[in-house]
Amino acid sequence: MTSFSPREIVSELDRYIVGQRDAKRAVAIALRNRWRRQQLPDALRDEVLPKNILMIGPTGVGKTEISRRLAKLAEAPFLKVEATKFTEVGYVGRDVEQIIRDLVEIALAMTRERKRKDVQAKAHVAAEGRVLDALVGANASEATRESFRRKLRDGELDEKEIEVEVADSGGGMPTFDIPGMPGSQMGMINLSDIMGKAFGGRTKTRRMAVRDSYDVLVAEESDKLLDQEQLTQEAIRSVENNGIVFLDEIDKICARAERQGGDVSREGVQRDLLPLIEGTTVATKHGAVKTDHILFIASGAFHIAKPSDLLPELQGRLPIRVELQALSKDDMRRVLTEPEASLIKQYVALLNTENVTLDFTDDGIDAIADIATSVNSTVENIGARRLHTVMERVLDEVSFAATDKAGETVTIDGAYVRKHLGDLSKNTDLSKFIL
């Protein structure tokens, strides 16, 4: 996992997310504490539990974006899920233990990818041997093989088509739930898993270019060199010690006192989450996984419900509270220009492919930020997401006629923005439907 300092994590998040210093600091400290715990002696390490986080803030201010960027930074098994996808055990839908099963699958893929790099050289030699077998036959003389090996390494045979035997992953086999099992405790049973184990690995012949065959064959040869048992144990260990789960939309599973009916299994989802966050053992097809040291970061807009509407026990298991601020006009302006892949940079690059140059002036950017902020305050505050709608409206004409404007420069200034949006943003009734 990553050994970045909290300051480095915050500065990395600053490249993509505007403001929200408190939230960035909280996740940076939590991530660094994962690393600190690994440095402790064994006896103390088991006692140090992660301090789970609850992020509260209106929609479109960066809660989900923080989780996405954190996933890339963490170099640890990371899963982002919406709490609304899950139902109480006994109802149709996914039960919360599926979160841990999915996390194990992610950890397995990460561990396998890392281990493959260690055996890549050996796997490449074995893959080259299989390509030569396909080109000249297994019984060809050594001189012939050497001659073709040289051509192969020089790239002369890259486009030649060959037939190779590869393992059949059985992706076309159906999956099904086990009837009568609440929440499908066994998860999805894959028929090909059962058949593969019963009849040994099946293979199929695939026809492909030499260049394309290397990726498939190197991956296959790498897997033969790996100890699958050890790989699985390492993945489970990684989940137990470094796993991070980001639970989005947690406010949507609050059962509000004044509203009855329709919320039949919402509080049940919270009850099911309790043992998972507190620490329990979840059975997966790869083995048992303890959740004591998995870090949970929950987030929600809490527009209608309040954090106090969560079950008291669940509130207690999310001790660190971070409030994210609504975006001001100045923040909107920064969102348009500062992030590494800001909206303006994206649109400039997109239209550049048609040889059209977009030139955004300062007053043009101000006008876009101003209109987005005023619509947010009069209609519904959806944060930075409003900028997508406004930008699409402003650039609608240019985007449509871009193919006829090759070689031209289009200046987006305040007058241009007001011409395309002015009346719309002033008319509240219209902007409710259009912006």
Curated annotation (Swiss-Prot):
Q: Does the keyword Cytoplasm apply?
A: yes
Q: Name one GO cellular component term.
A: HslUV protease complex
Give an example GO molecular function: ATP hydrolysis activity
Cellular compartment(s) = Cytoplasm
Q: Any one Gene Ontology biological process term? A: proteolysis involved in protein catabolic process
Q: Does the keyword Cytoplasm apply?
A: yes
Q: Member of which family?
A: Belongs to the ClpX chaperone family. HslU subfamily.
Complex and partners: A double ring-shaped homohexamer of HslV is capped on each side by a ring-shaped HslU homohexamer. The assembly of the HslU/HslV complex is dependent on binding of ATP.
- Protein name, per record: ATP-dependent protease ATPase subunit HslU
Q: What is the lineage of its organism?
A: Bacteria, Pseudomonadati, Pseudomonadota, Alphaproteobacteria, Hyphomicrobiales
